[in-house]
Structures are given as structure tokens and as C-alpha cells.
Amino acid sequence: MARWGAARMAACGPWGRNRRVGAGDAFEASEVRRDGRSRMMPACGPWGAGHGGGDPALERELSRDGSHYSISSAILPSLGARSNRRIKLRRFIISPYDRRYRIWETFLIVLVVYSAWVSPFEFGFIPKPTGALATADNVVNAFFAVDIILTFFVAYLDKMSYMLEDDPKKIAWRYSTTWLVLDVASTIPSEFARRILPSKLRSYGFFNMLRLWRLRRVSSLFSRLEKDRHFNYFWVRCAKLICVTLFAVHCAACFYYLLADRYPVPTSTWIGNYMADFHERSLWIRYVTSVYWSITTLTTVGYGDLHAENTREMIFNIFYMLFNLGLTAYLIGNMTNLVVHGTSRTRNYRDTIQAATSFGVRNQLPPRLQDQMISHISLKYRTDSEGLQQQEILDSLPKAIKSSISQYLFFHLVQNVYLFQGVSNDLIFQLVSEMKAEYFPPREDVILQNEAPTDFYILVSGSVELVEQQNGADQVIQVATSGEVVGEIGVLCYRPQLFTVRTRSLCQLLRLNRTAFLSIVQSNVGDGTIIMNNLIQFLKEQKENSVMAGVVKEIESMLARGNLDLPITLCFAVTRGDDFLLHQLLKRGMDPNESDNDGHTALHIAASKGNEQCVRLLLEYGADPNARDSEGKVPLWEALCEKHAAVVQLLVEGGADLSSGDTGLYACIAVEESDTELLNDIIHYGGDVNRARRDGTTALHRAVCDGNVQMAELLLEHGADIDKQDGNGWTPRALAEQQGHDDIQLLFRSRKAATASGHHHVPSSTTTRVAPAAAAASLIGRFNSEPMMKNMIHEDADLPSRVLPEKLRRKRVTFQNSLFGVISSSQAQRETDHPLSRGGLAATGSPNPSSGSRNAVIRVTISCPEKGNTAGKLVLLPQTLDMLLELGAKKFDFAPTKVLTVEGAEVDEVELIRDGDHLVLVSNEWDAEKMKGKS
């Protein structure tokens, strides 16, 4: 610790080597030395006083890492850099990116501007140092002398390693071998220079001209301003060009006057010929005249009133005009570039419009298509010119920023679309991140009828019409407005688009690609089921449209047959009340105890809806009758609440009771509703009226608070405790006294007296409890399966059926690549990986009798060819082959001895028979070859 403190003290210097991170210090963060070591050190020194952890000022400084300095000029961290929080420089060494050092540099630039004007002026017009001008020069030189000393302590960026070099020796050597000589020469006072120079060179401004070396700082300033987003680039460039022009004119004017002033014959000079007594004229008149001739020469106007009179002036004019050629080219080139850049979009727009018009005329396109082409190009130009290039901007951003922007703009819109009602926010966030916003002009086709389903759109603004072509004419079927979705039927069902979608006004649409959509659904199978249900419900509501009705029938047919191995959850089938679909799903090995995010199982839903057949199927396939959801509810409670007596009986026969649920909650609900029948049912089916809710409240507490004497009496009859405390320490007795319920207090006293005398028997709530389920059923677990999806194979879209010849037309639209088919691939993988599919269930999907699940309903077709019956009869499979033979004898009035398959193979074990098999009952005299011949 002492060593660390000493190191900290040694690190502090007058220039704040370890100063706080300022606006320009974003990448000075980690202590990265050339030896590769990294260490965190506190800041100290007058240019950045040290602060402890959690200092608000330091946090404010660190929050400025995103400033324009940190991006435009500071050090970028190298690949693999472990930290970028602070650079520890040596003692007395200053970072070139320190905020205060930059302020110092900006102050020096003001002095450079002064030097740029005064140095040529003194060189041309002032013969010797005088008054305030000489004093000002010396003050400016003093500041630059300080800067020379300061430069020996400023770290520099090594161009090889791109790291700050803070070795004082290397800094001094680099400065000494580069700019030190010129910097020192430009700060020599004029008086001292006149003394050390020969008499012929004792010009006042000779050494002053070396100060122009400082102009490199102005060039750096303009370079930095051009990259600064707070300044307009056009005006920064214009200011730079103006400064260059004025400086050239000023220098040339000073040189012109110097030539005339030093010429032996004053009248033989450019100004002496025009103004013979120019030496007696004021300094202002001479300077203005010089600037006048300089600028007329620069602009090549040349009125002829001023011209060169001697050889010196002619030679200078030659070089000056050569310089003007280069300067003029530089100015014109820069201004042309700035102007052309502003008009290039318009030029490209006109060229594109002309090309599109020529294309339409040359290919004899219909006027409607030509208008759509022109409208689309015009809208694109408008969005570009108004700064609405949203997709270009979003594509240039990182994924996280792009997703955040999309979520902010479109999340609530997508959330309210009917297709995504009830899905998780995670799915909507993923969908919004993949959507692309597009503009469409009025009367433009967005989707064409019968085209391949590649995208669907959500309307942000505007309206579109759904058009169907009938007998060669367009008929508007429906109008969609903001917040609605179009094209989803073709994408989800993988069939050609049903309608042409055409804009009615300027529209902004969100486009979602089918491939991206289905990829997201792959990882959200539960939400995919909700989307399918929403689609089916929406299509059912479109009864007046025959096309929609046909799509509904097709989807319903595929669902009923279960031919697609759809991974539709059991909850989906139960919600629809489709017991046949539920049976198909259970036979495929789906977990009967699979729950949703709230813990609801299919048995919860079936019990709540009172669907006896679904409840029976689920129990036969091993559903846990006492499964508990996140709220503590069990299926039996759902059935009791809805008064489904038949379902209650089925559940009780399957081993259901209320003891595994939150019976305290149940009893409180019954008391709140003052439902004595429900309370009696709770007690009858294993509920404990003394059990408390999560907050410690019992049903008796609730009855006392409500002043319900009848419910309180019923609870007391079944063993409710009047002295049981809730979460706040209140007992029912204390509550009755506190709230002044005299009837309940009297009831409590009489009940206590009867109990003390021993004349009243209080039945235990456990004496009527239903026997628990079998051990095997109680061990059945519930889990929320997350199916592993197979990689989806995106086949090429089929050609629209309506544009194919009749012989090449598909007989039926395939759903293999629809949303149903895509999600079904996940179910196949889940069945393969499911633990119940290995050992727990037979390979066929039928329950294995060895596992105790033989109670499943298996239907088979039996026939007796010896009696002339080949069509067969559908019967339930008995438990043994002997029972099956007896059943056949009754059905066909015949005594069979063997069971064969339709292929002629003899069946020896009933476990080999699958649901839906066709069995043949024959006698020993039957020849199997006859059956093969018939088949």
C-alpha cells in the first residue's frame, strides 16, 4: 500500500500527467505502455486534480467520451486492446489531446492570425521598430517562446505503433530534429535581429517573415473544423478559401511596395509613376494602393493605370502571375466541387427520369406502368432530398442501434397488428428489427396477384386497396389502412398472393421478408402457434369472401388430418375443442404435461372449458391431474369454478384433488363470492380451509372482514382456526372485535364454548379428502419444452397456379413451406429428441403397455375374407389377441384362429398392433396367398 501511495505521489506533475478524461480524451483511457503493461491510476496534477472513486465530476468527464474530439482526432484503440479508460503518462508529460492543452493551442491560433497580417506588413512598409507595434510583437513572441518550452513536455503519436510516446529524451530529440530551429528563429525579437545581421540585411521585417511558419497551426484548425459536425462544411471551406485569397493579396501588396520603396529611382516604379510623392503620402494611402494593384493582378483584370516600370517589378510580376494561375485553379476547383455536389442529385434525378421515359416508350409499356415508374423515381428523389434516406442510414449503423431505433418507431404499431395479438414482446422486438420502412407513391402496385409470397407489409401511414382480377377487370375487395397487414396469407400459407395490393395515397409501409420471418418463428414456436390461431380466426371472420373461405377450409382440413406433423401445442388443440387433433398430437409423443409461460397445461384449459373428451384423452395419455400453474390453480379447481360436474368426476376418477393447489386462495375466493356450494366442494375434494394465502390471510379472515356470518359459520364447522394469525399478526377473533362484528363475535364465543364442553365434534377437513392418485401418476412431471428446430430449407417459390397451363398446374397448394410446415419441422426434431420417444413410447407413437399407459384408445379395422367381408369394420382394440378373436367371432359369425396383416404376416402379440392398422381374421385353413392375390 505504501509503495502504491509513493507511486501515486511520484506520478503527479504540474501538467497533470494523469488528468481527468476530458472532451478529447475518450481514447486515453487505459494505461497502455510500450512494454504492454496496463494499470489503473488516479488522476492528479493542476491540469486534472485526482479524484476518488465515485466522484461526480469524474463521472461527468467520463460521460463525454462520445464527443467529436474523441472520434475525429484522438487515438483509436488497437485491436484486442483490453482497456481504453486511461493512459498513464510520465511525470511532467502532457497529452496532446488534453482539453486544456487544446485551449492553449486555440489561443495561439489567434496570435498566428495576427502574425500572418503584421509580418508581411512590417517587412514591406515599416523600416524600423516603432512604438506599440514592436511591443505587441515582443509579447506575441513571448507566448510562442513559452510554447517552445512546453512542446518539450508534450507526448507525440508514434506513427509506427500508434501509441503516445512519453519518453522525454525521445520527445526532445524528435522536436530538435524537426521544427525547433524554425520555431526559435521565428521568435527572435526584431531589435536583436537587427544587431546581429550585416548592415545590408538590417531590415526590420526580415526575421519577422519567419513567423509565417506558424501558419501551419491555422491549416490544422481548418482541418479539424471540416470534420466537426457542429460547423457547416460548406461555409468552413468557403472561409478557408477566402482566408487564402486575402493572405495572398496582402502578401503581394507588401512585396509590391517593398520593391518600389527600395528602388534607387522612385519615379521609375509602379507607384512612383502614378504617385510621384508617394513617400510623403500616408501609410493608409500607400497600403490601399498596393492592395488595389495586387488584387487587380490576381484577378487578371488589369486596368492599365498601374503597371511594372522596371525589371525587378517585371520579374516579380512574372512569378506572381504564375502563382495566380495555381491559386485560381485551386479556388475554382474547390468552389466547383462544392456547387456541383449540391446539384448532383438533381442532375442524376433528371437523367434517371429521362432514361425511364425512354425505356417505357421504347418497350411500349402501358401508360399506367410508365406513370408508376416516374412516380417511384420522383418519390425516391424527394425522400433523398428531404433527408429521409432511412434505410441507408439504418444500414450504416450497428445492429443494436438499428434495433433500438426500429423498436422506438414501430414497436407499438406492430404490437397492435391482429396477426401478433398475444405473442411475446421478444418476438415483436425481433420482428421489428428485421423490418424495413419503404415509401410508395399513390396508385403503385406493392404486391401482384399470383406472385410468389416473398414479403408481407404493415401499413404505417396511408391506405391501400386489395384488388382481385375478375373477368379481365379489377375489382376492389377491401381497403386497408394504417395498422393493418397485407400479403400475410400468401406468406404464412405459402401460396400465391391472393390479391393485388395497390396504394391509394402516399404510403409508408414496413416490409418483412418471409425468410427472415420464418427464421424468427423457428426460435419462438409457441408464438408461431398464436400467429396461426390469429390467422385462422381472422380468415373465419372474412365469411363474405369466397376466396378467404376456401383458404380456411383448406387449413382446417390439413389440421384435422394431422398430415403435416404440425408442432401445434396441445393447448392450441384444446382451445379449439378439437379432440381428434389432440389425439393425433398425443399419439406423436407430445408431452401431455407441457405448459405455457404461466404454467397452464392443456388439462387446465380443457377443464375450464368443460371438454370431457379432451380431458379423457389427456388423462389416458398420462397428464398430471394435479398440475399446478404459476397462480397455484389445478385443473380440478378450474372445473369447479365453471361448474362442469362431468369433468370434475373425470378428474376425480383420474386421481385429482385440491390438496396440491393453493387451497387457501380457493377458499378465499369462495368466501368473497359468498358461494357456499363452491366452499363445500373445496372441502369435499381435499381443500384445507385453514391453509393461508401467500399474505397469510385465511378464508376465515376474509369472512370476518366481509362480515359474512354464514360463511364464517360454515368454515368453523369444518375446522377453521379463529386464533390463526395473518401476515400482520391479526387473528379472525381480533378482526371481529376491531371491526365490531357482534354476530361473528357471538359465533366465535359459542363455538369455543361448545368445543370446550366436548359436545360438538368438529370434522377434520382431511377426513373427506379424496384418495390421491396412483404413484405412477403422481410422479409424472411437468416441463416447458423448448423444441430444437431443424434447419429450414427454403425452396424456390412455386410458380403461381393461375398462370400455368392446366396440365402443369399443381393439384393442391402445398403447405410444406407454409408457416405450418416450417414450424412442423421443429416438432419432428422435438419428437426425435424427446425422452418419452425413447422407451416411454413405442416407435409408432403408441403408448407402451409396459409403461402403464396402455389405456390409450387404439382403433383398428378388422375384416374376414373367408366370410366375404373385405371392407372391414372399425373397432376398438381389445387388450389381448384372444379377446380380439372373440370380437371377430361375434362380428362375422365365424370362429377365426389367427390374426394377419393385409400383407399376410401373422400377428403374435397385441403390442405390435398400431392405431389405424387393418387386420384380417382367418382360420387355419385360410391360404395367405389368396389374400395376396386379392390385394
Swiss-Prot record:
Its main location: membrane. Gene3D superfamilies: 1.10.287.70, Ankyrin repeat-containing domain, Jelly Rolls. Residues 1-106, 158-178, 227-240, 334-935 are cytoplasmic. It is found in: Membrane. It is a multi-pass membrane protein. A nucleoside 3',5'-cyclic phosphate binds at residues 419-538. GO terms for cellular component: monoatomic ion channel complex. The chain crosses the membrane at residues 107-127, 137-157, 179-199, 206-226, 241-261, 313-333. This is Potassium channel AKT1. It comes from Oryza sativa subsp. japonica (Rice). The lineage of its organism: Eukaryota, Viridiplantae, Streptophyta, Embryophyta, Tracheophyta.
